[in-house]
Amino acid sequence: MRLNDVKPQKGSKKRRRRVGRGISAGQGASAGLGMRGQKSRSGSGTRPGFEGGQQPLYRRIPKLKGFPVVNRKIYTTINVEKLADLPANTEVTLESLRAAGILTAAKGPLKILGNGDLGVALNVKAAAFTGQARSKIEAAGGSCEVLG
């Protein structure tokens, strides 16, 4: 076998069909574009989103106000009522809550929310507290420490 014997695989070099070159050529007259209408004209087709003259969807729906916050901080949140099961004077952190099985997945820094009641004094260390959560923890005799 020599280099001049190498030929492409049979059927791999299919010639493109030349359309619109007379009726006897097979694809003459309308060149596979059907009868009349917008899709058979030159420069054919409609723009994306065109719905045949009906008001398109992107113009029917309202423009929404505002914009998304780019670097939004995602917190792992927990309510004060979940902390009520812990023993008194426990130091509460994200790691200790995961070890205790109260939290299963941590998406980010810990934030304490104020839903429910707390009757136990706890030393809570978290990235953020709501006002209600802070007042309930301190009313129970505990302390709140914001981690930076």
Swiss-Prot record:
Pfam families the UniProt entry points to: Ribosomal_L27A
Biased composition (Gly residues): 23-35
Keywords: Ribonucleoprotein, Ribosomal protein, RNA-binding, rRNA-binding
Claim: Cytoplasm is one of the keywords in the record: no
Record text on subunit structure and interactions: Part of the 50S ribosomal subunit.
Known function: Binds to the 23S rRNA.
Name this protein carries in UniProt: Large ribosomal subunit protein uL15
Gene it is expressed from: rplO
